[in-house]
A protein has these predicted regions:
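Short, glycine-/small- and polar/acidic-enriched structural segments
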Residues: 1-97, 112-120, 131-139
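Short acidic active-site motifs
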Residues: 4-5, 102-104
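Pocket-lining segment of extracytoplasmic ligand-binding domains
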Residues: 22-23, 103-176
Length: 176
């Protein structure tokens, strides 16, 4: 659980952690700039899954209900950005937030017309439970459509390290 990792990083009980990208900035503030991002460990991995073949772009989500996790987390920020880049806001669709990806997968299994935003491997699990479900939008591809000039990547996970550990044990961190 990312919140447990965050608490351990803030308290100094944990030296290095792999965390969602948005959590790195929170840790940076909570530790008074006491952590650094040392690498990007996850790019992309976010998908919109549905049985509805008519969903072929972000704009096709208009007027629909989308199930997803984590209000105020990386998937939410990505969605909000993509909506804005496509001339939309969250008011153009209904977003139902669930507390974890397994809950979104359960909705997709129970409601055959549901649409969900899930990371891997949860989208694959959901598809295994509902044979009509497919990945209709790859959010990495949607992100890249908004970034043709600068090649920005959709970063979803990073590794953070306490600065004192980085300074005092540089060889160990390099080995990590």
């Amino acid at each position: 659980d990312a919140s447990e990792l965050a608490a351990q990083m803030v308290s100094g009980d944990l030296d290095i952690a792999l965390v969602p990208a948005n959590l790195a900035s929170i840790l940076y503030q909570k530790t008074k700039q006491g952590v650094e991002v040392i690498d990007i460990n996850t790019l992309g991995v976010l998908y919109v899954a549905a049985a509805d073949d008519s969903i072929q772009s972000i704009a096709d989500l208009k007027g629909k209900t989308l199930y997803m996790t984590g209000k105020g987390t990386t998937p939410d920020y990505v969605l909000q950005y993509l909506l804005s880049a496509n001339g939309m806001t969250s008011d153009d669709l209904t977003i139902e937030y669930k507390s974890e990806a397994a809950e979104v997968a359960a909705v997709l299994k129970e409601q055959t017309d549901a649409i969900g935003l899930l990371p891997q491997p949860f989208v694959t699990v959901a598809m295994a439970q509902n044979e009509n479900l497919k990945m209709v939008l790859n959010l990495t591809e949607e992100w890249e459509k908004t970034q043709p000039e600068n090649g920005s990547a959709l970063v979803t996970g990073v590794t953070v390290c306490r600065k004192d550990v980085l300074e005092d044990q540089a060889d160990a961190v390099d080995t990590f």
